[in-house]
Amino acid sequence: MEIDLNADLGEGCGSDEALLDLVTSANIACGWHAGGANAMRDCVRWAVQKGVSIGAHPSFHDPENFGRKEMQLPAGDIYAGVLYQLGALSAIAQAEGGRIAHVKPHGALYNQAARDPLIADAVVSAIHDFDPSLAVFGLANSVFVAAARHAGLAAVEEVFADRGYRADGSLVPRSQPGALIDDENAVLARTLDMVRERKVRAVSGEWVPLNAQTVCLHGDGPHALAFAKRIRTALEAAGVDVVAPGALQADEDA
């Protein structure tokens, strides 16, 4: 059994370089919700050095709210914004001897694309037109994953180790009770359930089936780094190989 571990980097948490020793995929902020040219370059350089798969982490242009405020924009604006951010990170990756392998939207853009077909199609179109070989990271069972596959893109279904789920498979909004799980032992158990059993317990009590292909580890918080290491260690102890999505695909094609 195999799984990818990913983390969102370049967002000013200060643990980026150390996190890259634990994850197999890095989603690098492209400057619109956090980060900037120097942070992007640092993260790309470290990822190249450590052999971690590089991904773009585009968002709405919303640094004031860390990209977490929902926006209703024309599809053309979303398309252009995603293209702009992909181009910036791709240029830096090329200069550092790497390349973008995947795209994972951030924050409100991620959540809206997960449920809104128009937003999902705008993001998917930008990715496809930029480079149809790129994989897409999206919420497991979401509209966004379906849109990516319909467009012929490789879609990697993502689960979250420390987030609450609703019965429909969506994440509990951060403004609501149960959105974040603080108990580390509970998070470890949930992660193993999602990876090995392909299911997660919703806040309402139901089991929700999902296809976990990559697990997001958060790097913010005083104990985040140590806890990320605990999750990786627990997965490996359970016989789960931690590998990047490209390796997963290669194994499936073999």
Swiss-Prot record:
Protein's UniProt name: 5-oxoprolinase subunit A
Keyword vocabulary terms for this entry: ATP-binding, Hydrolase, Nucleotide-binding
Keyword Transmembrane among UniProt keywords: no
EC number: 3.5.2.9
Biological-process GO terms, alphabetical: carbohydrate metabolic process
Chemical reaction(s) catalysed: 5-oxo-L-proline + ATP + 2 H2O = L-glutamate + ADP + phosphate + H(+)
Naturally occurring in which organism (per UniProt): Burkholderia ambifaria (strain MC40-6)
Similarity remark: Belongs to the LamB/PxpA family.
Top-level class of the enzyme under EC nomenclature: hydrolase
